[in-house]
Amino acid sequence: MTDRVSAGNLRVARVLYDFVNNEALPGTDIDQDSFWAGVDKVVTDLTPQNQDLLKTRDDLQAQIDKWHRHRVIEPLDPQAYREFLTEIGYLLPAPEDFTITTSGVDDEITTTAGPQLVVPILNARFALNAANARWGSLYDALYGTDVISESDGAEKGRGYNKVRGDKVIAYARQFLDDSVPLAGASYTDATGFKVEDGQLVVSLADTSAALADPGQFAGYTGTAENPKSILLANHGLHIEILIDPESQIGATDGAGVKDVILESAITTIMDFEDSVAAVDADDKVLGYRNWLGLNRGDLSEDVTKDDKTFTRVLNTDRTYTAPHGGELTLPGRSLLFVRNVGHLMTNDAIVSDAEGAEGAPVFEGIMDALFTGLIAIHGLRSTDANGLLTNSRTGSIYIVKPKMHGPAEVAFTCELFSRVEDVLGLPQGTMKVGIMDEERRTTLNLKACIKAAADRVVFINTGFLDRTGDEIHTSMEAGPMIRKGAMKNTAWIKAYEDANVDTGLAAGFSGKAQIGKGMWAMTELMADMVEQKIAQPKAGATTAWVPSPTAATLHAMHYHKVDVFAVQKELQGKTRTSVDELLTIPLAKELAWAPEEIREEVDNNCQSILGYVVRWIDQGVGCSKVPDIHNVALMEDRATLRISSQLLANWLRHGVITSEDARASLERMAPLVDKQNAGDPEYHAMAPNFDDSIAFLAAQDLILSGAQQPNGYTEPILHRRRRELKARAGA
């Protein structure tokens, strides 16, 4: 039984109540009683609106299901389909042209194009690493990944391999030549660096060279005659060449260069949503406490590496001498967003006894806005606790709001933020919103969604996986869908990605707000990422998601190769897609799959589902590197789970597979997943006692009940089964 404290109509879990009163409120100048009174009023006033929005989702889905069932034999008529969606209020009229008016936004969001990290807030070590990933070693990123081949004696090995190291140095020199070129010379031939009359001078064997563009020299450390580092700038991003002839690497380098540091994760999303498993008050407080530590600047974590233990803390800002003297200070940490949960889920960390509620758990999205907003106040202040470790330098709080369906839900978020600002005593407009364009009704009405948040919006971002999950679920009754791997090459996906950029640019995002694109999930395949992910900045995106600090450093190279703001200028005013393209349902044209192809698809998805769900349910891990059926490590979160479970639910609904096929595949894949996790002492095997494994049953639920889940979301089943496991463990 949860110990609770009454606060007006609310009963708050004591662990949350004490955390807020004893840790989050001190230092904010907010009175405890007035805060809880404000929480009570916001929850009581806004809960009915939240409920109405969810009812609208269900009503629209029911009408779409019915329409598809009635036309099941006929081919889909695009005009009739479009008219039907308009008639029921799913497809809305686009507003007149407008320009967003958001103000007080940091440069990292408005005028800097670069990588964006997303990390689970429940893991303090990951959160610290991400916040510190503003700067990363290019040498380390190259040496430790497959970007540099292990052929011809260049294996990683245990100790330093000079053959591999030389390949890294050559790669980095080429990057410098491409990004910050010298006039008539190459960094490969450099023998030293110095500063003369505010200009960079690079010594060569018999002569010297200057930068082709002297304006790219941004500063240095050490002395002008003997600098310890050289700071360069390109496309708004910084590159730092570290010089130390006494170091292991520098001693072998003609110019004494020991590393090249890239400005990497410009922004980071601290995630309370798809990458975490937070099902009760204890889980929520763990996340809130880590968010508090990041904002106060005192989050720390003991880390053991090579038998040595040290304490990891947040990096301080970086100071340089400007080219002509004076001091230049650059941020040492990534600018932090926080992703709240969406409008769907409730959490019994707080229950409400307001009229009609009868002890019902409170909507988690309302809670997150209140508590992450309160905590973020610490990141706006310079105090004894955090020194100068503030987050926003413009006084803004950045909240990513996921899984919104259409402009009414965006407007509700803005009303919620406004009410929270009143409770916290913050100026209206302090809490900015990042809109995830990951639900079909938002994609189709994106212009109206942006307009609903025109004075708060700081980013729009495509999320291919969730968006595909909603694509499948919305058209669940239309017929069987194509295979998961084929989804990326469909007409609607290209239209979706292009429309997001076009709509953002038309609303004045360039130079004012981020246009973002999705995650690279193959965490070990960095050579492929370096080759392919450049497509995102080339498409006009000022940011794109990466799964690790190393990936952020490697992806940063793309923003040196591509001037995103120049790309946006070329795209400005273009409309490259139509509503009909966005409405093209990815149905299989004919069921021409061989039995072995169907089995392969089902096994692949069942393995993916089990590999993620078993750690979610049994260990409370919401973001995992899960080996796929071919043992390729993939970064999985609830978005990947949604698409896998919805595809199988769709095939089940249309008789491509039976429930017996799904169960048989789960039983085939569970031993493989058990084997893949054999090295984890915390792991509990699912085979052979499948029906005793709550995780196995959760995976089965997600497939067999997938068609009935609200919008195909996985959270209701995951939360219920995780709480069941916690109850069993505590019994």
From Swiss-Prot:
One of its GO terms (cellular component) is cytosol. One of its GO terms (biological process) is tricarboxylic acid cycle. The modification Cysteine sulfenic acid (-SOH) is found at residue 623. It is found in: Cytoplasm. Keywords: Cytoplasm, Glyoxylate bypass, Magnesium, Metal-binding, Oxidation, Transferase, Tricarboxylic acid cycle. It catalyses: glyoxylate + acetyl-CoA + H2O = (S)-malate + CoA + H(+). Its EC number is 2.3.3.9. One of its GO terms (molecular function) is malate synthase activity. NCBIfam families: malate_syn_G (TIGR01345), PRK02999.1 (NF002825). This is Malate synthase G. It comes from Mycobacterium marinum (strain ATCC BAA-535 / M).
